[in-house]
Amino acid sequence: MSSPIEAWLPKSVLLLREYNAEKFVADLIAGVTVGLVALPLAMAFAIASGVPPQAGIYCAIVTGFLISALGGSKTQIGGPTGAFVVVVLGIIARYGIDGLFTCTMLAGVLLVVMGITGLGGMVKFFPRPVVVGFTNGIAVLIASTQIRDLFGLRMEHVPGDFFHRMGAIAENLHTLNGVATAVGFISLSVMILCAKFLKRVPGAILVCFGATAAVAIFHLPVETIGTRFGGIPSGLPHIAIPRLQPQLLLHLLSPAVTVAMLGAIESLFSAVVSDRMSGDKHNPNVELIAQGVANITSPLFGGLPATGAIARTATNVRSGAKTPVAGMIHALTLLAVILFAAPLVKNVPLAALAGILFMVAYNMGDWAEIPEILKLSKMDISVWLLTLTLTVVADLTLAVEVGMILAAFSFIRKISMTTTVSKVTDEYIEDGRAHILQDKAIPEYIAVYRIHGPFLFGVTDKIAEITEDIASLPPIVIIRLRNMTAIDATGIAALEELAAQLQASGRTMLVCGARPQPAALMHEAGFERHVGGENICENINQALKRAAEIHSRPVPAIAGTSC
């Protein structure tokens, strides 16, 4: 069993004691391999996000190193991913590049707080229809942003809005570049063939080097990184603190939450994939802290938001990575490219990168999940469809917010269907099931009701059935809570209101059998003041005994009855 200190140590530190030359060689091979795979992806994500390609490489170097060095996963690879493309585009369009840097740092702080407070496990509570909906939507948007480069269209500006973007593309189809289209579709075909038949061969590397060589050798008339961006500078930029704009901090909080939640979801999903492939078990809280530190640091070097990258992580594991050192070597490999081979990168054709991103969009789309979603309830289908639609036509922040609200209402509705408030009748006592009331006759002066399931907001109205015909109730009403699995403030208030109604009619309410969570919460809320501590019993036998004591005393006439 790990010590409390070890629970907060990065995997890189925990695995150092068993590190050796054999593991280093394996990490070196895997790190260089995944570094070469990451190069075209980092540039493609940056260009798709509306920033120069070096921003993606800087992000991959800085965050890739920090996430591996400080994270809670053995083989996780961090860096820019397709999930952030749409968000980054929207933030830059609204707040500019400094707004993006500020938003990324805010998201980093939120991720650190989530890790420190132990919220790493909270990601599992995101409903599947919401996750599938926004990944479907992001995939559609990424593909739509790459149509211009895939077909070599001459467009000065690509609108940020989906429908305006598609309209502008349709208007400029006459500018299609046949050579660029061929390069783009050949690149996409190579990616598909590698994924289908040559799973151990990184298609992105073949496409990047092959297309670059073809453009250089045959002088193909296609747009390249150099013709659009003027090449990539050698070396890392100087550390620069972004210009913080205090008046925008409140406006940036909402997109920062989106970046943080999206980063947390993707990084922990990626870590789970890594665990399944490597047989390891990641530490979600340490992983979130590392993700946060990486996102706080990335903007200082002009980098993008980052998270765990599922495809690169899988490549890392398949390439034989043994420890987080492989992830650090991946970052150093990218640094070596920037330092010694930056001039060569300018010849990479944008059509080839578009082909790579089309494949990325397809892979991240979770398309196989759609038939499964369609088998679920109408509410789940509505949550998925609305999240997908809003992601495409509005923005990801709104899509996730609306999706989560609808999913919450769906959850409440499903919970309400499982909670019952029913009277314990003779049929219940004699139905043959083993329970404490078996073979015991309930006196006529007692009515026993049981609450079965969670008694939370949204279901508390069911208790009103008890008092629908209050005049017909006997003098004593016992509420049995043995099968009530949970309660909240609304549930306690409903029980208090029931007690008040019964007391006003001259009746006595007893409660019994509360489980630890409901009992503790009811005690903290001062529930005893409403029914009397002597009327809260541990079990039904005590409640029946207490009822007999009350019945044996002279009592005034019950309201609503006649003598």
Give the role of each language-model region.
Residues 88, 169, 463-467, 543, ...:
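Generic hydrophobic alpha-helical segments
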Residues 363-530, 548-551, 555, 563:
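The feature marks cytosolic C-terminal regulatory regions of anion transporters and related permeases
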Residues 543, 562-563:
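Extracytoplasmic
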Residues 530-546:
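Short acidic-hydrophobic, aromatic-tinged amphipathic segments that line or gate anion-handling sites
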Residues 332, 518-519, 538:
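Short secondary-structure capping/turn micro-motifs that flank functional sites
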Residues 234, 453, 539:
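Active-site donor-binding loop signature of nucleotide-sugar glycosyltransferases
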Residues 1-426, 494, 506, 526-527:
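Transmembrane helical cores of multi-pass ion-transport proteins
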Residues 77, 511, 536:
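Conserved SAM-binding loop
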